[in-house]
Amino acid sequence: MYALKRELWCVLLLCGAICTSPSQETHRRLRRGVRSYRVTCRDEKTQMIYQQHQSWLRPLLRGNRVEHCWCNDGQTQCHSVPVKSCSEPRCFNGGTCLQAIYFSDFVCQCPVGFIGRQCEIDARATCYEDQGITYRGTWSTTESGAECVNWNTSGLASMPYNGRRPDAVKLGLGNHNYCRNPDKDSKPWCYIFKAEKYSPDFCSTPACTKEKEECYTGKGLDYRGTRSLTMSGAFCLPWNSLVLMGKIYTAWNSNAQTLGLGKHNYCRNPDGDTQPWCHVLKDHKLTWEYCDLPQCVTCGLRQYKEPQFRIKGGLYADITSHPWQAAIFVKNRRSPGERFLCGGILISSCWVLSAAHCFQERFPPHHVRVVLGRTYRLVPGEEEQAFEVEKYIVHKEFDDDTYDNDIALLQLKSDSLTCAQESDAVRTVCLPEANLQLPDWTECELSGYGKHEASSPFYSERLKEAHVRLYPSSRCTSKHLFNKTITNNMLCAGDTRSGGDNANLHDACQGDSGGPLVCMKGNHMTLVGVISWGLGCGQKDVPGVYTKVTNYLNWIRDNTRP
């Protein structure tokens, strides 16, 4: 009888259809305490597990067709279906999205090196960095030698981390059994089935070897590297050299071990000087010199805190997640006090970047104040730093009609050569390289104290963050923005998640102007855009428009030179 049904089914699919013989293995597991068998199918081509009667597409491209498969009594049955390009991006890492013409399923055609339903798995990753939170490789063996269980396994439904969580893709979980670290543990792990129960186990995934970075942070008090050359090119003397007898900082100092001194000639900063130094002989005379040692790049680093509260247009955030965010205030003209004006971006100790349109009223510089390190817009923070403004520079070619060249610089006032002091709440963002090219649909972040929605009469009381994707230039045109002028100095980004008109789409809004659009480059957050303008807030398929920072690197450099 089954054979007859099978034959009839194939006849019905003769018009361009392809019948795939069910050669996949049937997996049956008795769930304890339940008198029924869970029937699943494993797709041998993708290694994904599917439940009884579940259907899916798989990327077996034949012209403009893919295969539509479903799980029937433990066997995978497939036939080809026509597809079209997806109406919205759903694939990561440059994958091509194809959607079935007659139903809503989609499939991603992944570039070389990436696999997974949405190309979210990096098959080339052979080790994990730091704690492995961003590890997306394919290691699936634990330290005990056990094989990891698929995160989609029904037995994990009651576990805190499984492949069916709403944020599964973000955490790296899904229909696979690869090691992950979704809870920010010390290293990647997975669930295993042992002694009739599921339990977590650390994976044997190798950690990436870290090259010792020859640079110093702060004043270099903790520098323990091996650099031994000074700025003049002289070689350092060993700290235990007899020539140093009578000097305070030598290998014979009672605190030598704590200070990093010993039987070596490596640069150190035992006395709290401005940077590491060492003793040298110059013209047969004993002296000292600063070392030829660069300061570590700390721009774009942060202590990211996972947002706990979702609000209209984004998520509430802590300033330590966006320590380059500035709040710009201006004195009221006809009443005492000040009002919030715009956002800004700390790009160096004494310079803040913002949007030109924020300063169309040409306020006197001494009426403007910049606050750094503040989570709540109007409530002083414990680590905040406030500055008066020496001057601000609006781009000479700013067009207040089209918002072309919508960029401005503010110089912070200080009695010394430095202004903002680096901390967890205050840090510069990295400026991009001139040739920076990020892939289309790269996920980036913006932050600001702006309104939750366009109709709101109030700005947000707390800093917000939003997650958006970079639009390709072909989708950042006047045609896609109701015939508004788009120039080469602008870029577009928006929330591309599916949903109806009432979906909570992330976006910038009034009051966020001048704030940052940042993307991860390496392990540093890099500034790619300045929040400029948009049509409404959080409208589906309507991106926000940002000033393209790479076009202004020379302008920034020329105007911030001492």
Curated annotation (Swiss-Prot):
Keyword annotations for this protein, in alphabetical order, are: Cleavage on pair of basic residues, Disulfide bond, EGF-like domain, Glycoprotein, Hydrolase, Kringle, Plasminogen activation, Protease, Repeat, Secreted, Serine protease, Signal, Zymogen
What residues does the annotated propeptide cover? Answer: 20-32, 33-35
Which residue ranges does the record assign to the Peptidase S1 domain? 311-561
* Entry annotated with the keyword Disulfide bond: yes
Where is it localised?
A: Secreted, Extracellular space
Q: What is known of its domains?
A: Both FN1 and one of the kringle domains are required for binding to fibrin. Both FN1 and EGF-like domains are important for binding to LRP1.
User: What is the name attached to this protein's record?
Assistant: Tissue-type plasminogen activator
Lineage, broadest ranks: Eukaryota, Metazoa, Chordata, Craniata, Vertebrata
The gene that this protein is the product of is PLAT
